[in-house]
Amino acid sequence: RICSMTQKERQERSRKEIYQAALEEFGTYGYDKVNMERICGNHGISKGMMYHYYSNKDELFLLCVERTFQELRAHVERDMAHLSGEDTAAAVKDFFMIRERFFQLHPQQKLVFESAMLRPPKHLAAQIQALRAPMRRLNQEFIEGLIDKMPLRPDLKPEMVTRYLETIESLFQNMIVSYQGGHPAQDFHAMLETAGELLNMVLFGILRHADPA
């Protein structure tokens, strides 16, 4: 079968092999601990083939980031369709949990995502934000639709709440782990319960409001 491959098929096969190797390395060790030699050595890829397609680890890291954003966006779009009939608090929780469900299924992409969003290499920050733009637009559109249904405090503008929920969404996994004392949830059901507790406080606050006189 390999001998009968066209040149295009061989190129696609080589690129896929390199991508899978890079994803495994970046998705296990993060950006800083990975280099081209490590990827080649750990996965039996010749340096000649590697450098024929990619000139440095930044290209490979950005490829992993781009694919992660693309696959996460497709996953979120697919599951978002089921949230339209929910009340706003439940929809916010389930929207946040869509992403966590994706990362439970794809733990290597979870570390790539966290490396890109929480610990981005400074020289790649602008490119990462550009790659994230379609995902961010999807988040904004959904959050803005939710906010239209929310009885907001009179001192809050919708754009402020959009930025707030976007910020919470990007940090939500770390918030869950921290809230649980640094220990990840044992299963998805436990994570859902924790998410519900956290979002109750995020959305409704922790201070008892004084009764009107």
Annotate each language-model stretch with its function.
Residues 63, 78-106, 158-165, 192-195:
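Hydrophobic alpha-helical connector segments
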Residues 114, 125, 147-199, 209-213:
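Hydrophobic/aromatic-rich alpha-helical bundle segments in the mid-to-C-terminal region
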Residues 28-32, 106, 149:
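Short coil/turn segments at alpha/beta junctions that flank glycine-rich nucleotide-binding fingerprints
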Residues 13, 17, 21, 25-59, ...:
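Helix-turn-helix
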Residues 93-115, 140-141, 166-177, 204, ...:
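Helical hydrophobic small-molecule/effector-binding pocket
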Residues 100-140, 151, 159-160, 186-189:
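Short secondary-structure transition hinges
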Residues 1-13, 210-213:
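N-terminal intrinsically disordered/low-complexity leader segments
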Residues 66-72:
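Short, basic, alpha-helical segments at the C-terminal edge of helix-turn-helix-like DNA-binding modules
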